[in-house]
Amino acid sequence: MGVKASQTGFVVLVLLQCCSAYKLVCYYTSWSQYREGDGSCFPDALDRFLCTHIIYSFANISNDHIDTWEWNDVTLYGMLNTLKNRNPNLKTLLSVGGWNFGSQRFSKIASNTQSRRTFIKSVPPFLRTHGFDGLDLAWLYPGRRDKQHFTTLIKEMKAEFIKEAQPGKKQLLLSAALSAGKVTIDSSYDIAKISQHLDFISIMTYDFHGAWRGTTGHHSPLFRGQEDASPDRFSNTDYAVGYMLRLGAPASKLVMGIPTFGRSFTLASSETGVGAPISGPGIPGRFTKEAGTLAYYEICDFLRGATVHRILGQQVPYATKGNQWVGYDDQESVKSKVQYLKDRQLAGAMVWALDLDDFQGSFCGQDLRFPLTNAIKDALAAT
């Protein structure tokens, strides 16, 4: 009786530990392999124990079938999934779509019954062949006419995964990356319906602000700024998460995005605060080479000799040096974000992207690989 009771208690404890654990969903981008020198990142550089889920971005769709994108994707798939040899609890997913894929191609497939069916049927064998545990849908973004088709695609994909798992296989996971912008949420997603069929939802709570605004501003604020104009009251993490929950997304399926990159601007005057006029995006980073975007490891370089400020109400930092301004996340701000998602009882955090963090541990002076992602992991584990 005593032994049985203690065994039962142990089982309950294990279940509680399992089911109360937060997800840490981390994206890896295949094009990071092409960055020069120390910016080049391959899947074998990733920490197999850092994240609960790693999502490989992106797969393509050719002739209505899921397909590789890069010439060496199959090799990189193998590198990634080898990480599970020493951490069998790690889950890997393959993300299909992305910015370069475009919305129109997704729309054409999802709106045609035969094309949609062909695509859906092609997914499980592809994932099984290459060792993935699931699929992530990154349709950026469904148009107003696509809203129902996106719901149907998700519903039918999930049904196929359930059917495919019948012979005793472990069921494939299905997730989606969704915009955090109110206008896109309203036009693109039937949140309550798609939530029923997704294992988790990654809400992209970043890129709220960019050079198109004509002024400086943080791209991933936790809260609304004190001086935000009317439309800007929606452009923050707190509003996006709350709105998703009000629309019917279960907190237990919502994974909150935290960026390991910053958005930069070139200042147009001597003003350097939030809302200062700009002449355009910031100068490209040495490795990422994209105007207006800096990887966290490039930001660590930028911070040498820069002036750092904190936007207290939004709980995020920005830095200025000369005519350059960059809003980013640091270890302090990600801890605030993790505490927020815990208070909201969300499923966990999502990171875009591992290859934009200091993955070598050589840029940020901490002798620590993936310092931002590790800070998120530690905060998730803290009681």
Curated annotation (Swiss-Prot):
Keywords in alphabetical order: Antimicrobial, Apoptosis, Asthma, Cytoplasm, Disulfide bond, Endoplasmic reticulum, Glycoprotein, Inflammatory response, Lectin, Schizophrenia, Secreted, Signal
Keyword Zinc found: no
GO BP annotations listed: activation of NF-kappaB-inducing kinase activity; apoptotic process; carbohydrate metabolic process; cartilage development; cellular response to tumor necrosis factor; chitin catabolic process; inflammatory response; lung development
SMART domains assigned to the protein according to its UniProt record, in alphabetical order: Glyco_18 (SM00636)
Residues involved in chitin binding: 70-71, 97-100, 141, 204-207, 263, 352
Positions of the GH18 domain: 22-383
InterPro entries hit by this protein: Chitinase_II/V-like_cat, Chitinase_insertion_sf, Glyco_hydro18_cat, Glycoside_hydrolase_SF, Glycosyl_Hydrlase_18
Localization: Secreted, Extracellular space; Cytoplasm; Cytoplasm, Perinuclear region; Endoplasmic reticulum
Disulfide bond entries: 26-51, 300-364
Glycosylation sites: 60
Function: Carbohydrate-binding lectin with a preference for chitin. Has no chitinase activity. May play a role in tissue remodeling and in the capacity of cells to respond to and cope with changes in their environment. Plays a role in T-helper cell type 2 (Th2) inflammatory response and IL-13-induced inflammation, regulating allergen sensitization, inflammatory cell apoptosis, dendritic cell accumulation and M2 macrophage differentiation. Facilitates invasion of pathogenic enteric bacteria into colonic mucosa and lymphoid organs.
Similarity remark: Belongs to the glycosyl hydrolase 18 family.
Disease tied to this entry: Asthma-related traits 7: Asthma-related traits include clinical symptoms of asthma, such as coughing, wheezing, dyspnea, bronchial hyperresponsiveness as assessed by methacholine challenge test, serum IgE levels, atopy and atopic dermatitis. Schizophrenia: A complex, multifactorial psychotic disorder or group of disorders characterized by disturbances in the form and content of thought (e.g. delusions, hallucinations), in mood (e.g. inappropriate affect), in sense of self and relationship to the external world (e.g. loss of ego boundaries, withdrawal), and in behavior (e.g bizarre or apparently purposeless behavior). Although it affects emotions, it is distinguished from mood disorders in which such disturbances are primary.
Entry protein name: Chitinase-3-like protein 1
Origin species: Homo sapiens
Gene that produces this protein: CHI3L1
